[in-house]
Amino acid sequence: MSQDIHGEKILILDFGSQYTQLIARRVREAHVYCELHPFDMDLDAIRAFGPKGIILSGGPKSVYEEGAPVVEEALFELGIPVLGICYGMQLMSRHFGGRVVPAGKREYGHATLLPCGSPGPLFDEFFVDGKSPVWMSHGDHVEQVPDGFEVVGCSENAPVCAIQDIARDLYGVQFHPEVNHTPRGEQLLDTFVRQICGCTGQWTPGQIIEDAVVRIREQVGSERVILGLSGGVDSSVAAALIQRAIGDQLVCVFVDNGLLRLDEGDQVMRTFAQNMGVNVIRVNAQDRFMTALAGESDPERKRKIIGNLFVEIFEEESANIEDATWLAQGTIYPDVIESAGAKTGKAHNIKSHHNVGGLPEHMKLKLLEPLRELFKDEVRAIGEELGLPHPMVYRHPFPGPGLGVRILGEVKPEYADILRRADAIYIEELYRTGHYDKISQAFAVFLPVKSVGVMGDGRTYEYVIALRAVETKDFMTAGWYPLPYADMAHISGRIINEVKGVNRVVYDISSKPPATIEWE
């Protein structure tokens, strides 16, 4: 291995901001490794981690409130560059004797940052034509900066929006450079980690793959690994990465539950078994799933039936694989963060063991999670580097229960057939018209109600298909995608004419909230 891709790293201390994961993603986009840890990480752990720089996130609290989160005071004496964002800047200011007060006028949303004094190394290229658009989200502000600090930027409503103490490599911004609404924020974070902290940018897809291959080989040795292959992005990239590392020691189990997209099972087999030489066991279990789901209309019970039966079948197949001692999962970094947060209210060490995927204890298999350090966009980049087809790597999210939660009410084989054909037409047209990559998630929904229609000289009484397409950054909130009327009409016409049993198509224009993205 040519270099240690974890040798240069940034520590992000989380004070509860909704944007903290975005900070980490921006640092990774600068090709620098970073980790999220809780704000109260102790000093010995920080020293052991060995960061080249520290970022203090924003947060919902006020620094002058009783019980407000703080860092260990000696953190600022470590000689490591620190960037405080929003709450992080206020915390640093207060620590050094500055004054933080409630803002006379709160700032939420777009603002214009104006330069004050010398910009210094971090802000040298941040201002263009004497200003820089930024995104604010704060109710407090720094009224008086500490000794040794100078003000670099201000706004109409806040006299102190950016500060620096160049001698001690301490910097603070009241705005959020990590969000898209701060156009030059990505550049500012890149400048901090590359120029201020001195990172050289070793965290690249090629280096990540090389490092992962070495680690997988060291972990697994000559033992066998089994992986539940779903056809989704995460399990597909995990399979390709592990296969590169250990070849035919990997055995994938692909369960076709009858609730997949059109020809998805064949596509998975072509990609992995035929083109890449991965050992894939295909289990055709459509009848078992349809029998188990018969008569069930409750969404949560459907999910449990599908999930439990998948585990049951996976265990049956795994028992037939001799000498398998490892179970591989496509766990990614946000899964680790959310799993830790649900248990403790804090993000935990990325290296700590979390059985995110719910491995049954009695299987007694060791867990292999080669993607657990990566965000979704990094997983996609690695998938492309490994040679996976672009449509597979960049396909929209697909729920674990598959079409089982896109068929409202009871699931029947004929309903699934209608839905997968309608969905395939919809997705095909989104690709053809150039909309697919602009949409975060798009899919068709089968409504188990019949409507009256007219075809030829006769009346019809057939099913309804709903089309859904949303735009979102984080899937926590989402807006409906404004598909042009002409494209809607063409898609509707194709579905009605080509899918037997459908005579009406509707378009879902609900946002999240109040609606969810999926219908069930």
Swiss-Prot record:
Catalyzes the synthesis of GMP from XMP. Homodimer. Pathway: Purine metabolism; GMP biosynthesis; GMP from XMP (L-Gln route): step 1/1. It comes from Syntrophotalea carbinolica (strain DSM 2380 / NBRC 103641 / GraBd1) (Pelobacter carbinolicus). InterPro entries: Class_I_gatase-like (IPR029062), GATASE (IPR017926), GMP_synth_C (IPR001674), GMP_synth_GATase (IPR004739), GMP_synthase (IPR022955), GMPS_ATP_PPase_dom (IPR025777), NAD/GMP_synthase (IPR022310), Rossmann-like_a/b/a_fold (IPR014729). Its EC number is 6.3.5.2. This is GMP synthase [glutamine-hydrolyzing]. GO terms for molecular function: ATP binding; GMP synthase activity. GO terms for cellular component: cytosol. Gene3D superfamilies: 3.30.300.10, 3.40.50.880, HUPs. The active site is at 86 (nucleophile), 176, 178.
